[in-house]
C-alpha cells in the first residue's frame, strides 16, 4: 500500500511539473522544409524555408551549423623573394558550415545578436596548431577562405515577420545554402532574442546527401583511391589531347 501510494505521488508530481513547465518560458515553434537536400550533378545551391512563431516582443535569428571539424593547411610565406610552403597549420573545433540569418530591417533592440551566437564565438572556441603562433592572423585567413566559398557568413533580410496575433507572431525565413555545401547533417537553430539575450530556442535538422555522379565520385575517391587517381590522370591526358587537337584545327582553319 505504501509503495502504491508513493508511486502515485511521483506520477502526479511529474504531471504537475509538465503542466507548470508549459507556461514557464516563452514559446518558439519552428518547422523546416525541405528536411533533406540531394546534391546531384546539377546542384548549384539550395533554399530551405523555415516557418514558425516566436513571442511577439522578441526578434528571430536563425543559425545553420555543421559539425565541428579539423583542417590541415599549408602555411605559405616568402623565402628569398619566392612564395613557398613554410610549414603546416591545423585548425580544429570549427564548424564546417556557419551561416547566420537575420531579419528584414534588423538593428532594433529585439534582434541584437548575442555574442555567443556570432562568428566571434567560433573564433574563441577554435584551436590552432602552427609553427607561427599568430593565431588571429591565421584564423582571419581561414575565415576568409570559408566566406569566399559561401560556407561562413551572415545573411541579412532573410527573416520576415507577420503582424503579431496575441502573445505570438509568425515568421518566414528563406535560407540560401551555398553551392559548395558538403554532405552531412546540419542543425538549423532558431532563436528568439529579446534585449540581446536568447529567451527561447528550437532546433531542427536537415540532411544533405550526394546522389548520382557526385556520390559515385566520392565513393571512388575515398574507397578506391588508386583507381580514382588513375582515372584522374587519364581524364587530364584526354583533356590535354582534345585541347591540343582543337587548337591545331583552329589554326588550320585560318
Question: Where would I find each of the regions flagged by the language model?
Answer:
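Membrane-embedded segments
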Residues: 53, 63, 67-89
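N-terminal edge beta-strand
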Residues: 25-43
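Bacterial N-terminal signal peptides
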Residues: 8-18
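Juxtamembrane interface at the cytosolic side of transmembrane helices
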Residues: 236-254
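Extended, hydrophilic extramembrane loops/domains of integral membrane proteins
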Residues: 180-210
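Short, aromatic-rich amphipathic segments at membrane interfaces
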Residues: 176, 199-230
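Short edge beta-strand/loop segments characteristic of extracellular beta-sandwich folds
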Residues: 49-55, 174-176
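Membrane-proximal low-complexity regions enriched in glycine and acidic/polar residues
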Residues: 78-178, 182
Amino acid at each position: 500500500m505504501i509503495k502504491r501510494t508513493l508511486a502515485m505521488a511521483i506520477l502526479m508530481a511529474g504531471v504537475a511539473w509538465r503542466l507548470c513547465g508549459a507556461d514557464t518560458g516563452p514559446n518558439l515553434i519552428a518547422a523546416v522544409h525541405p528536411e533533406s537536400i540531394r546534391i546531384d550533378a546539377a546542384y548549384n545551391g539550395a533554399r530551405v524555408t523555415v516557418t514558425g512563431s516566436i513571442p511577439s516582443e522578441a526578434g528571430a535569428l536563425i543559425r545553420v551549423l555543421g559539425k565541428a571539424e579539423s583542417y590541415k593547411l599549408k602555411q605559405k610565406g616568402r623565402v628569398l623573394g619566392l612564395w613557398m610552403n613554410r610549414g603546416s597549420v591545423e585548425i580544429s573545433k570549427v564548424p564546417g558550415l556557419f551561416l547566420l540569418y537575420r531579419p528584414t530591417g534588423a538593428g532594433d533592440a529585439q534582434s541584437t545578436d548575442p555574442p555567443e551566437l556570432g562568428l566571434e564565438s567560433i573564433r574563441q572556441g577554435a584551436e590552432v596548431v602552427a609553427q607561427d603562433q599568430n593565431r588571429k592572423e591565421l584564423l582571419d585567413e581561414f575565415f576568409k577562405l570559408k566566406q569566399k566559398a559561401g560556407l561562413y557568413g551572415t545573411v541579412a533580410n532573410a527573416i520576415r515577420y507577420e503582424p503579431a496575433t496575441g502573445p505570438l507572431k509568425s515568421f518566414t525565413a528563406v535560407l540560401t545554402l551555398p553551392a559548395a555545401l558538403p554532405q552531412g547533417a546540419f542543425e538549423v537553430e532558431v532563436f528568439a532574442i529579446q534585449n540581446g539575450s536568447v529567451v527561447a530556442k528550437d532546433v531542427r535538422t536537415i540532411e544533405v546527401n550526394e546522389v548520382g555522379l557526385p556520390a559515385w565520385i566520392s565513393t571512388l575517391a575515398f574507397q578506391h583511391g588508386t583507381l580514382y587517381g588513375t582515372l584522374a590522370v587519364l581524364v587530364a591526358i584526354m583533356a590535354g589531347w582534345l585541347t591540343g587537337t582543337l587548337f591545331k584545327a583552329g589554326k588550320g582553319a585560318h
